[in-house]
């Protein structure tokens, strides 16, 4: 969609095949809706090199965009300069800023949902008042025990002395996803400078932005929000 809005004349989609060699039908349906010009059943680092340098069946492209695993990112780093890329992304991440009035159950659900990405995806919870993190940790353990899809994950608990200090930490770490669910969420949002996307208020869960409300899901990760922005037509 972003490529079409930007006026790209040739849109090429690559997607890893299933064991039967076929691309998932939902992916093909999405490609049809977006009017992709070419579709190839190939994924991983090999897809990146094929797009950048061409093969007997794939003509090279000028720009490669889209998320991927560590091997995909390594390949994008290797071909950067031969072709343009959207960003150098690491594992998906989430930071939540909360206080004593936050709904800790909802915060725990959002953190555990993000944990489904795997243990390499960093999760950070920042409180602006004493005593919140202990209660949140207990809630996360309860939710994780209820959800069979939750994997082992890394959750950092940060006790910030003030809301301003919490936002300073956010701007230095540049999270991909930032949830502001403290009482002062709306006021704090205007001070955020580097997050890939910002969810303001208790009912603005990350999953909504990833799958429903967001303009796209190609966001800077691993602190690269300081130098990269989300994928856009610009």
Where are these regions (language model features)?
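Short hydrophobic alpha-helical runs that function as membrane-insertion/retention elements
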Residues: 10-14, 38-41, 124, 178-181, ...
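Short, ordered loop/turn segments at secondary-structure junctions
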Residues: 15-19, 44, 69, 100-102, ...
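Short acidic loop-to-helix transition motifs that present clustered carboxylates
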Residues: 18-23, 42-50, 163, 185
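Short, solvent-exposed amphipathic alpha-helical segments in soluble enzyme
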Residues: 28-30, 56, 80-82, 110-115, ...
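C-terminal core of ALDH-fold dehydrogenases
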Residues: 172-234
């Amino acid at each position: 969609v972003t490529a079409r809005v930007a006026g790209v004349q040739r849109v090429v989609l690559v997607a890893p095949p299933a064991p039967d060699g076929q691309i998932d039908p939902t992916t093909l349906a999405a490609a049809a809706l977006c009017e992709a010009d070419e579709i190839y059943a190939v994924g991983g680092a090999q897809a990146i090199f094929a797009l950048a340098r061409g093969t007997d069946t794939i003509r090279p492209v000028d720009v490669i965009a889209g998320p991927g695993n560590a091997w995909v990112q390594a390949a994008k780093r290797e071909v950067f300069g031969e072709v343009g890329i959207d960003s150098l992304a690491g594992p998906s991440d989430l930071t939540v800023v909360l206080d004593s009035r936050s709904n800790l159950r909802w915060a725990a659900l959002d953190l555990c949902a993000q944990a489904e990405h795997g243990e390499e995806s960093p999760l950070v919870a920042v409180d602006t008042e004493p005593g919140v993190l202990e209660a949140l940790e207990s809630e996360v353990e309860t939710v994780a025990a209820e959800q069979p899809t939750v994997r082992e994950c890394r959750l950092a608990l940060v006790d910030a002395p003030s809301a301003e200090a919490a936002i300073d930490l956010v701007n230095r770490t540049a999270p991909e996803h930032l949830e502001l669910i403290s009482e002062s969420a709306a006021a704090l949002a205007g001070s955020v400078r580097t997050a890939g996307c910002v969810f303001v208020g208790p009912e603005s869960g990350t999953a909504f932005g990833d799958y429903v409300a967001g303009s796209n899901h190609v966001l800077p990760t691993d602190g690269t929000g300081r130098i990269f922005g989300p994928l856009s037509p610009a």
